[in-house]
Amino acid sequence: MGASRTGCYLLAVVLAAVMNAAIAGITSSFIRKVEKTVDMPLDSDVFRVPPGYNAPQQVHITQGDHVGKAMIVSWVTVDEPGSSKVVYWSENSQHKKVARGNIRTYTYFNYTSGYIHHCTIRNLEYNTKYYYEVGIGNTTRSFWFTTPPEVGPDVPYTFGLIGDLGQSFDSNRTLTHYERNPIKGQAVLFVGDLSYADNYPNHDNVRWDTWGRFVERSTAYQPWIWTAGNHEIDFAPEIGETKPFKPFTKRYHVPYKASGSTETFWYPIKRASAYIIVLSSYSAYGKYTPQYKWLEEELPKVNRTETPWLIVLMHSPWYNSYNYHYMEGETMRVMYEPWFVQHKVDLVFAGHVHAYERSERVSNVAYDIVNGKCTPVRDQSAPVYITIGDGGNLEGLATNMTDPQPEYSAFREASFGHATLDIKNRTHAYYSWHRNQDGYAVEADSMWVSNRFWHPVDDSTTTKL
């Protein structure tokens, strides 16, 4: 290891010790101005349809394989199918290549979708900027993305974290804050609840279209890693819609087959020095179910010498001290938490509760029918649990908290915002949460995270339990 890298390690250790000085758990005293959260009207600029006949819209990308050398490009054409091909080339090459995808449509009650295109670009080079074009003729649209560095233990990488976004004025503020944050995210880990179309009469799927156009300014340029939330279920037998997750699965593809997963709702990816596992809070997760069996086999596969950072995404939080959705994730926690502790998961991100909360490293796995132990305890092999369901959707904030604040809860606040996770190396990452009311560089909550496999020191930010 070179002297400069050793110096960075030592600096990170010192900074972590200073930044994570132990204090009591915080219920933020920040007073957010009380305002009704409302969706932006259909004629808002952020929903503008691109000009021209059959112009591609709702462009979004996500990782297209297990290791970061492929990208799924998706878009919608409204007037006719058009072309499903993607033309792409690297920044330093004039040689253009073509990838071909497929087209699908769906109906939902009285709504018929446009033509939804999905095309996977494969065999990309790591750490390379690519330009790509979709559409044909005068309405061709051009975008770009950058592939991640090659997977490795000390590869730095920065993730954005957003959940429960919706398409309100507050949603727009959240996305703007993420875009202008000086800690530049390179990919977004999205913890579920996208469009909130199901809050409209008959689950108005036009609101899936408007949401796709709204987020295109980010999703077309950097991959968003998708997690399904309860607002993606769209199960409405009263109007004849009995196939759960229909709009979500038609519109948003993920690389679940690349890793041997059996369903689109749970899958892993490697990206830089991180191993990301996406789970489904709204699919069966009990013993012997497909998700249970898959996760039981998946966790032992994670090679922490290759990808030191083990991160899990889900929608319903396991540790939640708000009265909203209180203990909804409890049965899933009972099933899977022992595995998380055994395999030393570093961080778990969830949404669902429309507020922000960060826990200490705690577990509640000691109970058996005799000992009666059913209280969370400090556990340095356990993850930090973070609820980031504060994206800004029209349902508003969860302001009612349990009192007193549980000892496992390090920081909580009912404000809209987003977060970033800046992985430095195999031992340290810097996490920060940013509320919408602050300047773009302001951190309302932060901590240095110590990796559980390579540097399992106490990184608590509050006094001991």
Curated annotation (Swiss-Prot):
Residues 1-32 form the signal peptide. InterPro entries: Calcineurin-like_PHP_ApaH, Metallo-depent_PP-like, MPP_PAP, PPA-like, Purple_acid_Pase-like_N, Purple_acid_Pase_N, Purple_acid_PPase_C_dom. It comes from Ipomoea batatas (Sweet potato). Binds 1 Fe cation per subunit. Binds 1 Mn(2+) ion per subunit. Can also use Zn(2+), Cu(2+) and Mg(2+) ions. Substrate binds at N230, H352, V353, H354. This is Purple acid phosphatase 2. It is found in: Secreted. PANTHER family: ACID PHOSPHATASE RELATED, PURPLE ACID PHOSPHATASE 10. The keyword Chloroplast does not apply. Homodimer; disulfide-linked. Glycans are attached at N110, N138, N172, N303, N400, N425. The keyword tRNA-binding does not apply. Its EC number is 3.1.3.2. The active site is at H325. One of its GO terms (molecular function) is metal ion binding. The lineage of its organism: Eukaryota, Viridiplantae, Streptophyta, Embryophyta, Tracheophyta. Belongs to the metallophosphoesterase superfamily. Purple acid phosphatase family. Its cofactor is Fe cation; Mn(2+); Zn(2+); Cu(2+). It catalyses: a phosphate monoester + H2O = an alcohol + phosphate.
